[in-house]
């Protein structure tokens, strides 16, 4: 069955161009256009054309002969069929609003049974005690509920789309970082390859020199040994001949002969001199600098591939009056004695904390904090957002713009939404703090053993600053962009 929309579209195609209604007794003129017979007759009467000039088509303005329009029976049949389709389509629409049980039009809605009712259904005993409303009245609250659901769904969809966009940005940042690291590795290993080739040539030259010295000593040794063997052969032949002579000849000069044999001492030549042997034994030590260079190279490459060392200093404008800063602003010590400091807006007045200068709005940065806690003391390390609360109580958790860990006497805690005591192999004395702004990571690790401590995941939208908190008489910390930061003396 044709839909109402398709029937309406088809009916528009058989409208009269004059009256804009459905063609009645359609007739065709010379140009091929169709009109109602009555409409075309009236058109000819109104225009009253000059007998010398033929009338023109109302649609295309082509002239036609007034007595030459003819009935279009085929089009008339099409119009009749379309009229029937329109009627059937209307009946189908009406049937949708009819009660299937009683054949009456549906006007009501039972909220208890969630049923659509006609007048007869409305008066039935099973619905008399129910809440029954007109369809439009009943639909109103449901429309409102649907609207609320739509608002919630759209909001959740926007949140998911925002998450998708943010995560896609993070992925792109990571891909960019990987590409950069690839180039870094290629470049560094190209330099390493050149360095190794140079070192290889140096070591091979040294080995070649040792080889030449050994061969030289071998030749000298062969000459010396050959000479000694020749002298011994001569003496042996002389004695063998002496031994076979008669007694009178044997005893002639026998004493000098024996003395010459007894005083003859064999010089025991050495093929490899002690000095050359020591050079051979010492050769592996020539590779030690190479091993050290390799270790330093790998450590440097690993560090540079991770983060850019941040050369930070403490900001005295933010320091709590109980914190004593060094002149170079690289160290801080807790003191119960209040320092004379102006109460400017940037300064913490209750939390014994201090920020670093500068802050970050992007990139990957790292710094090391050496911590020396007195008994019962604590030190808080991390990053905070630019608008962190400076006056009054400071709640240290991510919701307040604080991503930090706290080192206390004997334990370490992550200051997440609910502080979490961490299990570590050892209490860190030096902590590496690292931030990847675009990816949203704040990472803590033992700067000596490289043991991971904790990682926060965040979404930074404004500048963040390195953050430090300190408590306990005698507790102190110092800063460094590299490992091995010195503690306060």
UniProtKB/Swiss-Prot annotation:
SUPFAM superfamilies: B-box zinc-binding domain, Concanavalin A-like lectins/glucanases, RING/U-box
Keywords tagged on the record: Coiled coil, Cytoplasm, Metal-binding, Zinc, Zinc-finger
Transmembrane residue ranges: none
Compartment(s): Cytoplasm
Example GO BP: innate immune response
Record bears the keyword Coiled coil: yes
Zinc finger residue extent: B box-type: 94-135
InterPro entries membership: B30.2/SPRY, B30.2/SPRY_sf, Butyrophylin_SPRY, ConA-like_dom_sf, PRY, SPRY_dom, TRIM/RBCC, TRIM10_RING-HC
Domain B30.2/SPRY: 292-486
Top-level taxon in the UniProt lineage: Eukaryota
GO molecular function, one term: ubiquitin protein ligase activity
Binding site for Zn(2+): 99, 102, 121, 127
Family the UniProt entry places it in: Belongs to the TRIM/RBCC family.
Entry protein name: Tripartite motif-containing protein 10
Upper taxonomic lineage: Eukaryota, Metazoa, Chordata, Craniata, Vertebrata
């Amino acid at each position: 069955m044709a839909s109402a929309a398709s029937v309406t579209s088809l009916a528009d195609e058989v409208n009269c161009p004059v009256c804009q209604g459905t063609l009645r007794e359609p007739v065709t003129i010379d140009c091929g256009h169709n009109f109602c017979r009555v409409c075309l007759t009236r058109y000819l009467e109104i225009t009253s054309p000059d007998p010398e000039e033929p009338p023109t088509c109302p649609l295309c303005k082509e002239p036609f002969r007034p007595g030459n329009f003819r009935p279009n029976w085929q089009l008339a049949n099409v119009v009749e069929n379309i009229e029937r389709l329109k009627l059937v389509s209307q009946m189908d629409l009406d049937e949708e609003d009819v009660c299937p049980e009683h054949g009456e039009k549906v006007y009501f809605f039972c909220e208890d049974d969630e049923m659509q009712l006609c007048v007869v259904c409305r008066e039935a005993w099973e619905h008399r005690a129910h809440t029954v409303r007109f369809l439009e009245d009943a639909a109103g609250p449901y429309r409102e509920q649907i609207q609320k659901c739509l608002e919630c769904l759209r909001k959740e969809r926007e949140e998911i789309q925002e998450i998708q966009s943010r995560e896609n940005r993070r992925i792109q940042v990571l891909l960019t970082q990987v590409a950069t690291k690839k180039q870094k590795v290629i470049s560094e290993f190209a330099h390493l390859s050149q360095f190794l080739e140079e070192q290889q040539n140096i070591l091979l030259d040294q080995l070649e020199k040792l080889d030449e010295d050994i061969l030289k000593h071998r030749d000298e040794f062969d000459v010396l040994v050959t000479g000694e063997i020749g002298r011994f052969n001569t003496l042996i032949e002389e004695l063998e001949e002496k031994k076979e002579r008669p007694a009178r000849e044997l005893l002639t000069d026998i004493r000098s002969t024996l003395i010459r044999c007894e005083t003859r001492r064999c010089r025991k030549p050495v093929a490899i001199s002690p000095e050359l042997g020591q050079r051979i034994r010492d050769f592996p030590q020539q590779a030690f600098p190479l091993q050290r260079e390799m270790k330093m190279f790998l450590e440097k490459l690993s560090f540079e591939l991770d983060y850019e060392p941040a050369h930070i200093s403490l900001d005295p404008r933010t320091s709590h009056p109980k914190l004593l800063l060094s002149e170079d602003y690289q160290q801080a010590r807790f003191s119960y004695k209040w320092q004379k400091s102006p109460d400017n807006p940037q300064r913490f007045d209750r939390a014994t904390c201090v920020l670093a200068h500068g802050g970050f709005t992007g990139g990957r940065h790292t710094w090391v904090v050496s911590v020396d806690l007195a008994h019962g003391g604590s030190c808080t390390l991390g990053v905070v957002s630019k608008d962190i609360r400076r006056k009054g109580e400071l709640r240290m958790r991510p919701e307040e713009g604080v991503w930090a860990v706290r080192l206390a006497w004997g334990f370490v805690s992550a200051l997440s939404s609910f502080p979490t005591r961490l299990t570590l192999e050892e209490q860190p004395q030096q902590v590496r703090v690292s931030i990847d702004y675009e990816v949203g990571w704040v990472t803590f690790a033992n700067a000596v053993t490289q043991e991971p401590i904790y990682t926060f995941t965040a979404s930074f939208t404004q500048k963040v600053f390195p953050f430090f908190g300190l408590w306990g008489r005698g507790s102190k910390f110092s800063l460094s962009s590299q490992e091995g930061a010195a503690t306060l003396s």
